[in-house]
């Protein structure tokens, strides 16, 4: 496990974007051998997408041979709805880079057969071998994608009922009206995430501090989905200072010294 303790959320976004670009460029993708990138939605990764767009515009990276898989999508929300994850991804990222439309994969929450859609999604991921890098965020309760507390750590892509806490948290995108938030979503599973070659979680803000503590210092258990990343060979937590408030001082000190070069790469 790696923990990259930075000062601000802006530094987290810059570090994450640079890491993604470095991974893509080192991989040197082609049409026959694309780089497979897993992506989240939500407020935390928004600035990272802006940084990636800047790097693309500066001609430091191309997404022409990048294949993407998104983590989740609401059930029953039309794709053209401004708060659908289809709309989010196109408005905030895909419309601004050179990714090929056929390389974009987002779960269809409006299909008549949700189980078949989830099975198809898993098979599509497998057809590429693996996801090379999966970027994600984390909820205040430690959930990743829509794998809420008590989700099976062996779970695969499936339909999930959203918790009351998640409905309340997401109501800020729906005029602060909980009744407008879809009650169900299609989501990748915890095991789907763990199958990725590398997982990078962005953790920012004091309200995520308990989740980060559970992920780094806590025991692996299904009430804290984030803790499953302790089982992953290449997991990276990129966090700002407020998110480290619940970690032991010696934990932060250890990773600050260990990742000194990585930290300074975004500060220089």
From Swiss-Prot:
Record-listed E.C. numbers: 3.5.99.6
One Gene Ontology cellular component: cytoplasm
Q: In which pathway does it act?
A: Amino-sugar metabolism; N-acetylneuraminate degradation; D-fructose 6-phosphate from N-acetylneuraminate: step 5/5
The record's annotation in InterPro entries points to: Glc/Gal-6P_isomerase (IPR006148), Glucosamine6P_isomerase (IPR004547), Glucosamine6P_isomerase_CS (IPR018321), NagB/RpiA_transferase-like (IPR037171)
Spell out the catalytic residues: 72 (proton acceptor), 141 (for ring-opening step), 143 (proton acceptor), 148 (for ring-opening step)
Please list the GO biological process terms of this entry: carbohydrate metabolic process; glucosamine catabolic process; N-acetylglucosamine catabolic process; N-acetylneuraminate catabolic process
| Keywords, alphabetical | Allosteric enzyme, Carbohydrate metabolism, Hydrolase
Complex and partners: Homohexamer.
Question: Cross-referenced NCBIfam families, in alphabetical order?
Answer: nagB
Could you tell me one molecular function GO term of this UniProt entry?
A: glucosamine-6-phosphate deaminase activity
Organism of provenance: Histophilus somni (strain 129Pt) (Haemophilus somnus)
Q: Which PROSITE patterns match?
A: GLC_GALNAC_ISOMERASE
The organism that produces this protein has a lineage beginning with: Bacteria, Pseudomonadati, Pseudomonadota, Gammaproteobacteria, Pasteurellales
List site positions: Part of the allosteric site: 151, 158, 160-161, 254
Q: Catalysed reaction per UniProt?
A: alpha-D-glucosamine 6-phosphate + H2O = beta-D-fructose 6-phosphate + NH4(+)
Q: How is this protein's activity kept under control?
A: Allosterically activated by N-acetylglucosamine 6-phosphate (GlcNAc6P).
Q: What is this protein called?
A: Glucosamine-6-phosphate deaminase
Task: Spell out the family assignment given in the record's similarity comment.
Answer: Belongs to the glucosamine/galactosamine-6-phosphate isomerase family. NagB subfamily.
Signal sequence residues: none
**The protein's role, per its UniProt record:** Catalyzes the reversible isomerization-deamination of glucosamine 6-phosphate (GlcN6P) to form fructose 6-phosphate (Fru6P) and ammonium ion.
């Amino acid at each position: 496990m790696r923990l990259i303790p930075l000062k601000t959320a802006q530094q987290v976004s810059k570090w994450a974007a640079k890491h993604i670009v470095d991974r893509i460029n080192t991989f040197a993708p082609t049409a026959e051998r694309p780089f497979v990138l897993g992506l989240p939605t939500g407020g935390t990764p928004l600035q990272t997408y802006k940084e990636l767009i800047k790097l693309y515009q500066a001609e430091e990276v191309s997404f022409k041979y990048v294949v993407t898989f998104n983590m989740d999508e609401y059930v029953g929300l039309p794709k053209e709805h401004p708060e659908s994850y289809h709309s989010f991804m196109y408005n905030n990222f895909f419309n601004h880079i050179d990714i090929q439309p056929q390389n974009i994969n987002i779960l269809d929450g409006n299909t008549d057969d949700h189980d078949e859609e989830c099975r198809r999604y898993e098979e599509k991921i497998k057809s590429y071998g693996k996801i090379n890098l999966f970027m994600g965020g984390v909820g205040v309760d430690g959930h990743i994608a829509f794998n809420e507390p008590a989700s099976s750590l062996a779970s695969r892509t499936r339909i999930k009922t959203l918790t009351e806490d998640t409905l309340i948290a997401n109501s800020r995108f729906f005029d602060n009206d909980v009744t407008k938030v879809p009650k169900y979503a299609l989501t990748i599973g915890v095991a789907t995430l763990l199958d990725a070659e590398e997982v990078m979680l962005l953790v920012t803000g004091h309200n995520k501090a308990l989740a980060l503590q559970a992920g780094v210092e806590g025991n692996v258990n299904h009430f804290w989905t984030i803790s499953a990343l302790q089982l992953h060979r290449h997991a990276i937590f990129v966090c700002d200072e407020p998110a480290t408030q619940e970690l032991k001082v010696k934990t932060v000190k250890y990773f600050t010294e260990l990742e000194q070069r990585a930290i300074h790469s975004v500060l220089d």
